[in-house]
Amino acid sequence: MTTVVNPVLRGFHPDPCFCQAHGKYYLATSTFQWVPAVSLFESEDLITWTPLGGALPNLDLRGIPDSAGIWAPDLSYDEASDCFWLTYTIARQISGAFKDVSNYVVTARDPRGPWSEPVFVNASGFDPGFFHENGHHYVINPQWDPRPVEGHHKFNGLVMQEFSLEDGLIGEARVVLGNSDAVKWLREGPHVLKHDDWYYIACAEGGTGKQHRIRMARSHELWGPYETCPEPLVCAWMSDSPLRKSGHGNFAQAPDGTWYVSFLCSRYLPERDGSEHVFDENEFGCTTLGRETGMAPIVWRDGWPRLATGGVAAPATFEVAGDAPAPQTSFAYQTDFASGEDLWSSGWLCPRRVAGGWWNVGAEGLTLKGGDSPSSMFERSELVQRACSHAWHAECSVAFEPRHYNQTAGLICEYDSRAFHYLHVGWDENQGCRVVQVLSSGKGVFTMPLGDAGIEIPASVATVRLGVTVDHYDLTFSYAFDDGEWQTVADADGNPLVLDASIMCDELAGFSAYTGTVVGLICVDMWDKSATATFGSFAYRDL
């Protein structure tokens, strides 16, 4: 047996959905405003997960608000046609009474692609899932009710309807699991499976925060009526598990017959004194890494799935058959960009757009053409990697010759357009030279922590190296010129400038914040859009 440590996918990997086909496992996670949309992974043993890139590489999400975009993909395998189905939601707004969502499905013989052109499914709600049986396909999702009057509830039950790729929706949609007995549970993210003589619905409940969980319902008939299990399958608010917000899962069966459940989870920052965060539903906590992907084996008892580890707490570890090497629990990555690697299968993400000629990999490295500011929801020229730990370091090298203070390029650490720390090369007209500067945005405040005077870059310097180190709550920047020694960015008193890394978390980024901390490269030109920056290297490692 091999012990696997949760989360199996660390950092911003929410809403996992996986399936097993031909002896391999395939998993999809939400990407929201980031593209290539819908991150895909492959594994032979549930231990090592290889990124396959995004299923939707050319999706244009310009103008989509933060944490809108691609929600809760459902990846399923139809044995009858030997085909994978991937359905997903495009949410065009995040707040207000309306959701303005559209649901689509794409298909492929191989999860590596190519995937078909999207087929519209419906717009009645979000988080659709597909169930396949005897050549028929059924879509299930929560139906949304925006009417702000008594007697109506926004999460107005789970509805199911037959669907075909050729003819679209077939027959009438039926409510198969209502909210009359538990209006407050906010049921969403449904998946249907069949085991023995039972049909099961697995759905998320309790919202995306500390009360999140997986609830099961079952019926002998696909269309119901369904009875709800009195206890959740997975949750964290009833336990002392370090994996909080646990919920939103689905099931896959291994070739040896063992069943597994996937779920999202979050690891809170420890208290500032180093002690473990103590859970209290009314207490504030920080989850800078966002929601991650966990897994656990299940057993069937009295016709219900139960965690094989016992109880309802998301397990910190679990066992899988075989003698595979223990999984890596820390992550490291580096590139010189000139190696010809596929950026997308290496985990790079962009905000809202991939196409448009704003990036190029050549002999000198990665060149970015100046785009919008870090606060823009339209045309940013930016590539990022997910942060995977509460303590990590990243660095890059950049060649950049700005001519105006509105032209900048460098290393950005962000949660979204509202919460970021940005170390960059810019131009200072008063100093008459290039400078290293810092911009920060968080908690509704936009600041320049170094004040108006940046760190002067000598005219002879060709390449500036920029670094960031995050140690839980504390973030520090560093820089070096060409092959010179690293210097810590200091405040006016000569002390290391220590910034607040915790502003980049679900709880502080703002209402409906669903992503996680990322770090990467950006080039901004709010002057004449002519500036370009060439990044010769990038490296990330957990500490």
Give the ranges of each region predicted by the language model.
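Carbohydrate-active catalytic/glycan-binding domains of CAZyme proteins
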Residues: 1-543
